[in-house]
Amino acid sequence: GCGKPFCFNTIMARLRARGKVVLAVAATGIAALQLDGGKTVHTGLRIPLDPCGNRRGIFAIPITKNSALGRLIMNDIDLIVWDEAPMTHRDIFDSLDDTFKKLRNDSRPFGGVSIMLGGDFRQCLPVIRRATCAQQTAASIRHSTVFNAFGVVHLITNVRVELCKLRDPSRSQKLNEWAEELLRIGDGEYLVNESESSPFESRLPAIVHSKAIETKDDVFSMIYSLFGDLAELSTMDPRELIKQEAMYSAVLCPLHVSVDFVNRCC
C-alpha cells in the first residue's frame, strides 16, 4: 500500500514525455495491469515458461539481434521497469543479465541497460514446488550475481491506510495498529501468544466450529453467517454499505481449489 505502481507510472510518464523508451513488465498479470503499457515479464522479455519447475541455472532466452525486441534492447531502450521483482526466480535474473550482455556486447550488469525493480520481500517469493525454506531463500533475486548492482530506495508511508483514515478518522488508531501488525508479520516478529492483543478479528461461523466445509449448503451457511443477506447488501446505498461489517470481512482459503469451489457455489 505504499504506492509503488503510482511511482512507477509517474516516472514512466515523465520519461516518455521526454521521448525516452521505457519498457514496463511485472512478475504477474495483475501487477502488469497496474503499469501503463505493462506486460508480464514472460511476454515483454520473452522469458520461457517453466511449468514443471525443472529448469536450473542460466538458460537461453530467445531474443535475437534481428528481432524487434533485440533491436530495442541493443539500440533504443532507456529503462526497464520491473514490478513484483521479488517473485522472480534468481535464474531468470541471471539469464537475462547474460542475454543482455551478449546482445549489447557489454560486460556491465544487464549489458548497461537501466532497470528499476519494485516489490516487497515480505510478500511472495518465487514459487518452488516442495521446496525447503533454504531452497526458497536461495531462489530469491537477492542471491542473484547482479543484485548488489542495484541501489535500494524504501517507500515507508502506507498510502492505502492514510486514504482510509481520511475517509473515516474514527478508525485511525485501529488502522495504524493493523498496518504495524502487518509489518511485524512480514518481519517475522509476530508472536502467536500475543494474539489476544492483536487488532485482527476472526469471526468463525458456528458451522466452521462443528464441521468441515464440503457442500454447497455448507458454503451458503458460512457466507450468510459472515456477510448476511447478500441480496439485501446489493440494494444498499454505498454510504450505508461502507458502514456494514460485511465490508471488512473476508473468507480465507488455503488452496486455489478451495477458492474455486467457494466461487462456484456463490
Task: List where the protein language model places each region.
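RecA-like helicase/translocase P-loop NTPase motor core
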Residues: 1-266
